[in-house]
């Protein structure tokens, strides 16, 4: 049943006529800062197609027709609409992938502290999977923890070997 207090839902292929002029006004105000002639694209005057996407936003806008090249002095609307995703993508590409210290974790598995040596190996693998998922901060944190635990268990293993050799050769037979 439809609730009379709520406005009726629109078809995904239609937009209200009030939305397009408001959007055009906003874009005009942004682009008029340089006081240059505007070349508004046909995507604002034409109908907009809304398409369901699989992300957190419920819809994405796909314009009909070709996009016209923007003026060289004014920023393009395409880049201004997608500035946050472009900045995020370029920022993620500029950062180098954090180290996961997998080789160090595998090397620590050869020390005599055997069951505990699996812990840095697990953290190293978790760090590698975090990089693949795009969580660079989590991958960096897990990589540092894997490095710390690997070095700790290697030192502990060396101490155990020194104690075992010392006890073995100092005890009279």
From Swiss-Prot:
Locations listed in the record: Cell membrane; Endomembrane system; Cytoplasm, Perinuclear region
Cytoplasmic side: 1-102, 124-150
GO biological process, one term: cellular response to insulin stimulus
Principal cellular location given in the protein's record: membrane
GO cellular component, as recorded: cytoplasmic vesicle membrane; endomembrane system; perinuclear region of cytoplasm; plasma membrane
Family per similarity comment: Belongs to the CD225/Dispanin family.
Annotated organism of origin: Mus musculus (Mouse)
Protein name per Swiss-Prot or TrEMBL: Trafficking regulator of GLUT4 1
Keywords per UniProt: Cell membrane, Cytoplasm, Membrane, Phosphoprotein, Transmembrane, Transmembrane helix
Chain ranges inside the bilayer that never cross it: 103-123
Positions on the Extracellular side per record topology: 172-173
Membrane topology annotation: Single-pass membrane protein
Expression induction or repression: Target gene of PPARG, expression is induced upon PPARG activation. Expression is inhibited by TNF.
Region (Disordered), start-end ranges: 1-20
Highest taxon of source: Eukaryota
């Amino acid at each position: 049943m439809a609730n009379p207090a709520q406005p009726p839902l629109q078809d995904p292929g239609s937009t209200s006529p009030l939305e397009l002029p408001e959007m055009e006004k906003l874009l005009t105000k942004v682009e008029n800062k340089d006081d240059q002639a505007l070349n508004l694209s046909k995507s604002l005057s034409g109908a907009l197609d809304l398409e369901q996407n699989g992300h957190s936003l419920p819809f994405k806008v796909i314009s009909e027709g070709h996009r016209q090249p923007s003026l060289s002095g004014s920023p393009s609307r395409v880049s201004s609409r997608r500035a946050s995703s472009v900045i995020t993508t370029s920022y993620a590409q500029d950062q180098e992938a954090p180290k996961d210290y997998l080789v160090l974790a595998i090397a620590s598995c050869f020390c005599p502290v055997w069951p505990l040596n699996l812990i840095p190996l697990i953290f190293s693998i978790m760090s590698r999977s975090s990089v693949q998922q795009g969580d660079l901060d989590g991958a960096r944190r897990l990589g540092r923890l894997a490095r710390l635990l690997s070095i700790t268990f290697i030192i502990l293993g060396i101490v155990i070997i020194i104690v075992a050799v010392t006890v073995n050769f100092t005890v009279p037979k």
